[in-house]
């Protein structure tokens, strides 16, 4: 979404999980989806289909982060299965 103009940037998933705030995470996901719909509607209205104008969302990875050698741990909600499942559900609901 960034190449298609301005977009809101939120912290990595592991940082959001560190808040332990399920309601906040749902609000973040809602903001992301609302902004995405707005960009899509604007593209359709103005027929702006140039290269790099498609919508790409980098959502959290719900794998459990167990091995620190895995280089994508920052994309997860961490190593707690309960927290990861709870936050994953709330992100989808948002």
Report each predicted region and the residues it spans.
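Glycoside hydrolase catalytic-domain context in secreted enzymes
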Residues: 1-94
């Amino acid at each position: 979404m960034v190449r298609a103009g301005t977009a809101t940037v939120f912290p990595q998933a592991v940082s959001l999980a560190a808040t332990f705030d399920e309601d906040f995470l749902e609000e973040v996901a809602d903001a992301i989806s609302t902004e995405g719909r707005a960009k899509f509607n604007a593209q359709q209205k103005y027929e702006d289909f140039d290269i790099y104008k498609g919508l790409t969302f980098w959502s959290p990875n719900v794998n459990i982060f167990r091995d620190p050698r895995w280089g994508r741990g920052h994309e997860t909600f961490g190593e707690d299965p309960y927290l990861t499942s709870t936050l994953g559900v709330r992100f989808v609901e948002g």
